[in-house]
């Protein structure tokens, strides 16, 4: 956030009104390029336009934008466009990347002022995404039902632009955003992003999505807090609404008229709400009747107040003791762990059967094998195959790629309660690496391993195993009891590709 303070030369009292001129500043594109370098890729390297950014191209783009009376961009005419010429896709992505940095400035400056001791007016101190892990460990096993919610997309792109009006008061910036959205995507491509979205910056879409979700989440949390004095556990990225608290009085009147008869069913102190990306869960210890009320409340709120098409099938009610919840790349459920205790009292003995609830987190092995199959590491049955596209690289480069993928998978899924599936994935990657090297050297797998020896596979030892061997005593390290438990790493949220296997 210091980078914004260094470069911005805008009046502090009018920063929100003059964001559009920043699109003509070279440092904005440099910041956008730095953001692009921080992405974490799992299976493939970044081969997009981001590695072609240069100061000469940026200057050429700014000069052309400054000389034109109208910003004419056409994604359907990449070769004949008089404005961008043959570099239409590159320039288009540069503009969207720069604009993604610009629209984040008001929110970033608000965080900077808060870190400097200035009070942020009436903002919620909501918990971060990392609060999901203690929630799963401490609270999840005590709950009975969960609502598995797929958050719907807006039915019209204008809704995304309207959501930013609370943030950006610069009409020119909003017009540029509206023009770009209508030019490069329609409703179908926005819901299932394909090639048309590849030239539009994903960071910008993530910002627009979060700002839109905050609209109805703020109302939901307000109603949730009115029905219970306990705060809900929220793990999404929320953006403060400037004028929300000025409308609370109106919202109370609206919900009083429309939901008065149902509010008494919502008074549940054990409700927990968590959102991550396009999914949300609402977990409760109460009955299925309460969860049905919440289900239809969500659907009505989306359809009648935010004009988003939603069906009741997008909100599923699952009983945790019978179904698994697919969330954050894990299949989580609550299973009963039976135990038998013999109690001796004088001459009489009693056998007491006791069942304790225990959190069970499993790896979705089928979807992971499907992802490895798409990346050509194995076939659809999970049998390892060679990676022919990497056979032209050096041996060290091939090994480094496989080791990086194996460590990322092991690092992310270290929170699994059953490690057998993880060992199978690591076996697929190890054998695929050996087959790729054997293919390169025109040898068999058996002969290649015999020549290199068993030390060859030591590269696949995960990073955490080396760390634990240094930190913990040898008695714990050799007993291997440490690895049977769940270990949550706070940096796994950076491995975005593992959350959505499909």
Swiss-Prot record:
Localization (cell): Plastid, Chloroplast
Keyword RNA-binding on this protein?
yes
Record's keyword terms, sorted = Chloroplast, mRNA processing, Plastid, RNA-binding, tRNA processing
Q: Which domain of life is it from?
A: Eukaryota
Family recorded in the similarity comment: Belongs to the intron maturase 2 family. MatK subfamily.
Q: What does this protein do?
A: Usually encoded in the trnK tRNA gene intron. Probably assists in splicing its own and other chloroplast group II introns.
HAMAP family referenced in this protein's UniProt entry, alphabetically: MatK (MF_01390)
What is the official name of this protein in its record? Maturase K
Query: Which gene specifies this protein's sequence?
Result: matK
């Amino acid at each position: 956030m210091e980078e914004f303070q260094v470069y911005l030369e805008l009046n502090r009292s009018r920063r929100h009104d003059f964001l559009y001129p920043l699109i003509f500043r070279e440092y904005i594109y440099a910041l956008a390029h730095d953001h692009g370098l921080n992405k974490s890729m799992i299976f493939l390297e970044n081969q997009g336009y981001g590695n072609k950014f240069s100061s000469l191209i940026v200057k050429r783009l700014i000069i052309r934008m400054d000389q034109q009376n109208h910003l004419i961009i056409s994604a359907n005419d990449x070769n004949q466009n008089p404005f961008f010429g043959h570099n239409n896709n590159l320039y288009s992505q540069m503009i969207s990347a720069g604009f993604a940095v610009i629209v984040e400035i008001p929110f970033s400056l608000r965080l900077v002022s808060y870190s400097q001791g200035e009070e942020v007016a009436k903002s919620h101190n909501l918990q971060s995404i990392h609060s999901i892990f203690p929630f799963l460990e401490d609270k999840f096993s005590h709950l009975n039902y969960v609502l598995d919610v797929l958050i719907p997309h807006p039915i019209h792109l204008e809704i995304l632009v309207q959501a930013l009006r609370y943030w950006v008061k610069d009409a020119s910036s909003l017009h540029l955003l509206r023009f770009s959205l209508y030019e490069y995507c329609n409703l179908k491509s926005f819901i299932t992003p394909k090639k048309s979205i590849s030239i539009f910056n994903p960071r910008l879409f993530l910002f627009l999505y979060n700002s839109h979700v905050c609209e109805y989440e703020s109302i939901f949390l307000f109603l949730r807090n009115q029905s219970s004095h306990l705060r809900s556990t929220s793990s999404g990225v929320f953006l403060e609404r400037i004028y929300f608290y000025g409308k609370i009085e109106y919202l109370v009147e609206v919900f009083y008229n429309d939901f008065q008869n149902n509010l008494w069913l919502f008074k549940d102190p054990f409700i927990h709400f968590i959102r991550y990306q396009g999914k949300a869960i609402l977990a409760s210890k109460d009955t299925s009747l309460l969860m049905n009320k919440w289900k239809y409340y969500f659907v009505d709120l989306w359809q009648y107040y935010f004009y988003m098409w939603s069906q009741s099938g997008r909100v599923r009610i699952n009983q945790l003791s019978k179904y698994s919840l697919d969330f954050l790349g894990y299949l989580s459920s609550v299973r009963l762990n039976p135990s038998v205790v013999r109690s001796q009292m004088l001459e009489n003995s009693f056998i007491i059967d006791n069942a304790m609830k225990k959190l069970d987190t499993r790896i979705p092995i089928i979807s992971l094998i499907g992802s490895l199959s798409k990346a050509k590491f194995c076939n659809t049955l999970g049998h390892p195959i060679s990676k022919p596209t990497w056979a032209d690289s050096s041996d060290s480069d091939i090994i480094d790629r496989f080791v990086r993928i194996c460590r990322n998978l092991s690092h992310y899924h270290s929170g699994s309660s059953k490690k057998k599936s993880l060992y199978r994935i690591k076996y697929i990657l190890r054998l695929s690496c050996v087959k790729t090297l054997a293919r390169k050297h025109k040898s068999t797998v058996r002969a290649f391993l015999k020549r290199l020896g068993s030390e060859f596979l030591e590269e696949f030892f995960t990073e955490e195993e080396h760390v634990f061997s240094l930190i913990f005593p040898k008695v714990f390290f050799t007993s291997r009891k440490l690895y049977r438990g769940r270990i949550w790493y706070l940096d796994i949220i950076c491995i975005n590709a593992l959350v959505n296997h499909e």
